Swiss-Prot record:
The keyword Transferase applies. Prenyltransferase that catalyzes the transfer of the geranylgeranyl moiety of geranylgeranyl diphosphate (GGPP) to the C3 hydroxyl of sn-glycerol-1-phosphate (G1P). This reaction is the first ether-bond-formation step in the biosynthesis of archaeal membrane lipids. Belongs to the GGGP/HepGP synthase family. Group II subfamily. It catalyses: sn-glycerol 1-phosphate + (2E,6E,10E)-geranylgeranyl diphosphate = sn-3-O-(geranylgeranyl)glycerol 1-phosphate + diphosphate. GO terms for molecular function: imidazoleglycerol-phosphate synthase activity; magnesium ion binding; phosphoglycerol geranylgeranyltransferase activity. Sn-glycerol 1-phosphate binds at residues 182-188, 213-214, 235-236. Pathway: Membrane lipid metabolism; glycerophospholipid metabolism. It is found in: Cytoplasm. It comes from Saccharolobus solfataricus (strain ATCC 35092 / DSM 1617 / JCM 11322 / P2). This is Geranylgeranylglyceryl phosphate synthase. It comes from the Archaea. Pfam families: PcrB (PF01884). Its EC number is 2.5.1.41. InterPro entries: GGGP/HepGP_synthase_I, GGGP/HepGP_synthase_sf, GGGP_HepGP_synthase, GGGP_synth.
Length: 255
């Protein structure tokens, strides 16, 4: 069991924290917390304590629908004692908070709407500067099912079996200077991204891969890690069965 420590000063150091872990050949796990789906502070404390003790490397905070600034700040404040990063996973510019340690500064590369590729980022940039937030440049690419994120973001989703197209997007992100590529099958996706796609991409690109959506078992998570995923994200399973989420985290961290 991890011991709860005094909060580390992570602001301005989150990207380095993650890259250092990856350079030490660690595989990482992010726990995605959707403030809209949290029913009480007691529920959140119970869930996050178990995720932290299992070894999750960071908390992602965000959701596609129904998240207010007040709810976002409230959730981040309840996570304040944990010495792992609290990173905002934004769906729009309303999800910004100086209380977080960092922000995934994302561009939805396969959107048909320029707003989600660069428009929202332009509007948000002065606010981020004012709040003095650390940004982690991240290419967001939606694959397969896509779910609500694909619908809202007007994404031209990449088919599960089109490995070449997914690789082309990943290489484009790498050449643009992004720090990470986040491959997303969508919240609650019936099928996760295929390990074969991950290994195909990894044969062509060296950029760290974040993979999420439809990951409901430790077996699936480990296949993705073995294929080359650097960071696994779980969200829905945390809400529906925290014990399964714990098994996934322990499987990844004990790999």
């Amino acid at each position: 069991m991890r011991i709860l420590k005094k909060k580390m000063k992570l602001k301005g150091k989150v990207k380095k924290y993650l890259i250092d872990k990856l350079n030490d050949n660690e595989k990482l796990h992010f726990s995605l917390i959707d403030p809209f789906k949290i029913n009480s502070s007691d529920e959140l404390k119970y869930i996050t304590k178990n995720l932290y003790n299992a070894g999750t490397d960071a908390f992602l905070i965000g959701g596609t629908l129904g998240v207010s600034k007040d709810k976002l700040d409230f959730v981040i404040s309840l996570l304040d004692d944990y010495e792992i990063p609290k990173i905002i996973f934004p769906s729009n510019i309303n999800l910004l908070s100086e209380k977080a340690d960092a922000l995934l500064f994302m561009s939805l590369l396969n959107s048909d709407d320029i707003y989600y590729i660069i428009g929202a980022q332009i509007v948000a940039a002065p606010i981020i500067k004012m709040l003095q937030m650390e940004v982690i440049p991240t290419a967001y690419v939606i694959v397969g099912h896509g779910g609500t994120a694909a619908h809202i973001g007007k994404a031209r989703v990449i088919p599960y079996d089109n490995f070449e197209l997914a690789t082309a997007y990943t290489l484009a992100a790498e050449y643009l200077g992004m720090s990470f590529v986040y491959l997303e099958a969508g919240s609650g996706a019936p099928e996760p991204i295929r390990p074969e796609m991950i290994s195909f991409i990894k044969n062509a690109s060296s950029i760290p891969l974040i993979v999420g959506g439809g990951i409901r078992s430790v077996e699936v998570a480990l296949k993705l890690v073995e294929a080359g995923a650097d960071i696994i994200v779980t969200g829905n399973i945390i809400e529906s069965d925290v014990n399964k989420a714990i098994k996934i985290i322990r499987g990844i961290k004990n790999k």
